[in-house]
Amino acid sequence: GGYLASAFACQYPERIASLINLSNAPNKLPDEEVITRKKIICLVEAQGYTGITLARIKTFLDVSNHSNTLIIECIKAMDSDFGGNVLLQQLNSTTLRKNLLPQLFRLNIPMLFCFGDSDLLVNKAIIEQLAKTNACIKQQRFDHCGHMLPLEQPFLLAKALSFFIDSKLN
């Protein structure tokens, strides 16, 4: 969702008043993640989809949440609701992507990037550098959090979002 929202903002900047991006840096994915996704696509196309594995779930979570059954079961339920066809569509449409950061950097709108300190899919250094060099861009790093920010730190995320929205209104 974050990459698509960023792409929309770049394509139609006149329609966007602000941008909030959770657990996403709108740039290329790490090579390792691209390889993993391509393997998943091949496997699902060849053998069908039987659901997300615990090992894959753990790659999205901070180590402190590896045994949090509430979060793990929630991820499994979301995965089950969407199924293999939606997974394939998502992976095929979001794996190979261009770097949108230079375009976003030129937009003159308030932006907030929120990410976990142990999120393996977000290039945190790039977001932090952008926030240092562009006053429109704010970033919020969440401790003890991986890629599943809304599940791992829901209250702190709600507070950060509320603060960002309130600051835009005042």
State each model region's role.
Residues L29-E32, Q47-R106:
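Conserved alpha/beta-hydrolase catalytic His-Asp/Glu region
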Residues E128-I137:
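Active-site-adjacent alpha-helix of alpha/beta-hydrolase-fold enzymes
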Residues L107, F113-F115, D119:
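Short beta-strand/loop motif that positions the catalytic acidic residue
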Residues G1, A5:
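Gly/Ala-rich beta-loop-alpha elbow adjacent to hydrolase catalytic centers
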Residues L120-I126:
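Conserved alpha/beta-hydrolase "acid-adjacent" motif
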Residues S6-L54:
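Flexible "cap/lid" loop of the alpha/beta hydrolase fold
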